[in-house]
Amino acid sequence: FRAKEIQWQNLGNGDSILKNGAENIHVALESSSKKSLDQNTQRPSLDNGKTIHFQGGDGSTLILKDSINQGAGALYFNQNAIVRAENNDTTWLGAGIVVNGDKTVHWRVKNPINDRLSKLGTGTLYIDGQGKNLGDISVGDGTVVLDQKSFNGQQQAFNQVGITSGRGTVILANNKQVNPDNIYFGFRGGRLDVNGSSLTFHRIQNADDGAKIVNNHRTY
């Protein structure tokens, strides 16, 4: 899907529409009507959600008009992009975000409490929304920059940050992005760049070797 500005509207009943003015594309979402069919190993309600690939529209903006639960569907970005919500409380859930190559996606959408956003791909996910986000993130590849802005006196990029696989890097723009005690290193660890910020850890959670905490002072 390629366009300079795309609006994403939740139509309900497991359906949504992407609009760019000249073209409309329907995208299936998580379907509550299929929850009665869910079992331990099969979740038709989540499987109803489809994946979207964005490419060819470098610098485009995706605007969420409503909260989206994409279920088992993911977002793949083969281009630079901005993703934002029309309302600061609008949320996105799905199978994850993949930013490929050397591309950068500015992500300005929250995820709900108890939800864990999964980031893959060698590109950069730049978190620069507003206010306090209650969701979590798991970084398995590429770079994630946490630069959430203050809104109404509240500021937090994620409640919990996990770095896994040894290929992920998380960069902090400042010490307001996440509680240091809620940062953990999973299988094969990864890299946390405190980026000149002063942090106090009461514990460092690591499930494997490969965890690195570095301080490369960048300006954002």
Where do the protein language model's features map onto the residues?
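Beta-strand-rich extracellular passenger or scaffold domains
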Residues: F1-Y220
